[in-house]
Amino acid sequence: MSLMSVGRMMAFVFAFVAIVLWGCAECKECTNNNAQSHTHRYQILTSSNESWNIISHYKLAPKDDHDHVLADLLPRKLLKEEHQHDWDVIMRKTEKVSVLKAPHQRQDFLKEVSLHDVRLHEGSIHGRAQQTNLEYLLMLDVDRLLWSFRKTAGLPTPGTPYGGWEDPKIELRGHFVGHYLSASALMWASTHNDILKKQMTAVVANLSICQEKIGTGYLSAFPSEFFDRFEATEHVWAPYYTIHKILAGLLDQHSIAKNPQALNMVKWMVDYFFNRVQNVITKFSISRHYQSLNEETGGMNDVLYKLYSITGDQRHLLLAHLFDKPCFLGLLAVKANDIANFHANTHIPVVVGSQMRYEVTGDPLYKEIGTFFMDIVNSSHTYATGGTSVDEFWSDPKRIGDTLESTDNEESCTTYNMLKVSRHLFRWTKKVSYADYYERALTNGVLSIQRGTEPGVMIYMLPQGRGVSKAKASLGWGTKFDSFWCCYGTGIESFSKLGDSIYFEEGGKNPTLYIIQYISSFFNWKSGQIIVNQTVVPAVSWDPFLRVTFTFSLAKKTGALSTLNFRLPTWTHKDGAKGVLNNESLSLPTPGKFLSITRKWNAGDKLSLQFPITLRTEAIKDDRSQYASIQAILYGPYLLAGHTTGDWDIKAAPNASIEDWITPIPASYNSQLFYFSQAFANSTYVFTNSKHPLAMQKLPVPGTDLALHATFRVIQGKSSTNCTTLTDAIGKTIMLEPFDHPGMRVIHQGREHPLTVVGSSSGGPSCAFVVVPGLDGRKETISLESKSHNGCFVHSGLHSGRGVKLSCNSSSDATFKESASFIAKRGISKYDPISFVAKGVNKNFLLEPLLAFRDESYTAYFNIKG
């Protein structure tokens, strides 16, 4: 062999090895490039640590270097032709796609009804949540929302920017504005609030000015250089995530708010990004594009399929396909239960987009993907709330028992997106199980994230462990103008569309309506020519039935023949279920099916439904033996959490029914709740059971642990008092039961010893006190005299700096009289209408719906043995 031949051979070997090594360096990953939570990435961006400068320039997959290696080995023309070939093949495949009718035109899917035709009842639980959200949306300032968009476009920036994730230093800025566009469109449809309409129209108009100023179709709150980094697989925080929110918001402004300007803006934006993606594929490869999707891209495929269903533009369909993340959807396509360690809220929107692909193209593979995904999440990764994820990621299948150790369970965004998944599946299949899931996740995972009726106060995570608190998760409650987390964006959307999944229509010869959620509301059903008024009696624990009444009025002089289908939830049972139409009893199907009524509805028709609400336990999704006893307690769709700082042990007798160890709290008990206060040093103090023994603390705000500890149920002998004030109980003997320790009693331990709390069976005469007029002589005060120690009174010790005790000081001592006199007022805390007592091993537990908790500590799962 000649030296020349040897040289050629060696060159070939080196080239071959180089290509192999290049391929190894390119070994594919399917995940997030940056395996970090959003909260961690926000902390990096706001850190002053210089190490961020290193990270920010780190190439997560330094493909340019490998491309240079390949370019040195292969002719440039061949490379260019190969990548151009990739693009040409993609184009040809898209042109061959058989596209069905637009989703709203398809007869095989249930159709959404317009939010413009649905109105929630004011004062209902859902109506209050919607109103709280409306108040927040009206607080938001147009100039502050637009600040970073104007800055990016080189326009004047009046006002000051918002903080949190909308801060000008944060790479995800602008995402909340996209959510605002969607939320305001949905809220306007739900309320027709004129002020909101004016504000959201102004935001769209000014965003259009920004887009025109940039001049390329690009529109965002950050510069397009972020996409240079994205396409180079350099570190950048999810620019397409924000673009998806803006596109989706503008599309909602077009579709829901009927703003024609918004659609033109969307199409121009998509033209810009179509060209960017095409350039990446032709310059590098289709593989390079898919590698970049390992950074979070939100629901880009979803919004692009929706856009295509409006425009019919083949480029929109192609671009949607290119955001279907094949390495993730492929796992689901082959039915691999292998989603562990994926960032949940990165990938659920990809599934939602694949569901839209099915609706647009009819490809059954994508129906199977959505169905399988819902099955594995529900069977392996879901908490009793219906939510999923821990620290923003999925754990191993059926291994969520040890995730209770974290306070960062159930990212709120994931619940928002899982509701979309289940909604699609219900519309395709009409299966009650999907409607039941929707009810559970909406009730526990959405209604739980507002802090009562405080506008703009929401949470990121919903802890599921022992002794946890919404206020004490890693981020706790957000603030109105300095949080703007991803979950604020999905939150304002969720509370703007509470009426969008109550009613669904079905095409066919006769108009058909499915009522799948029992939420007090009016619905103007135009196809059926009737107005439906649904009134739900709020659920209570002492009367375990869901009661719903439907009344009807005619939209025209005569009604049309139509069919109404009413969901029978799987959490009820047939015994005790009733249906009455105009005083005539109906035969009901078994739970998990629909009651179907076909008739010509008339004004004055009345349908009443009654479903028993069952108490039940549900095992945690963990098949390891050490977690076999860990269970949640549910009442219908409501997850019941216990007021406890960590105790969770319950022992039920063998073969005992759940009603044997869980009992409802009667309605009358709220009238028996009081707190006891004194004024001292220009402050109001109350005696509390925050720790044993009892102590005086400053008057707490409602919704806190201290508010619970300061509230006591006044028990009068074996009965209870229903006095308006305790001055009405003068001369009567009472006992005090701590609000969050049902079955326990406040007792004294003898003269000059502190008061403490024991079980009711251990109290004896030490737990009895006589209500007497206040020793300080004021008509509004009372004193509590020991039944067993005449002349000895409950004494605050404020003046002496000591705890609450039984004191027998001289009756002539003015300071003593003042310290033994209290103003008794209605309890700071009160029992939720759905409240139970569960018998525990060490203590009894007060159970209430998770949605009722604000800052209080709670336990969502219990260790139930027996």
Where are these regions (language model features)?
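Cleavable N-terminal signal peptides of Sec/SRP-targeted secreted and luminal proteins
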Residues: G7-C27
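C-terminal beta-rich recognition modules with glycine/proline-rich loops and embedded aromatic residues
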Residues: C30-P75, G370, D436-L546, T590, ...
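Active-site-adjacent structural elements in folded domains
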Residues: A232-E234, K283-Y290, A333-N341, I400-N409, ...
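Aromatic-lined ligand-binding clefts that engage carbohydrates, nucleic acids, or primary amines
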Residues: T563-L568, Y675-F676, M735-E737
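A structural signal for the beta-strand cores of small, secreted beta-rich domains
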Residues: F680-K698, P738-L755, S788-S800
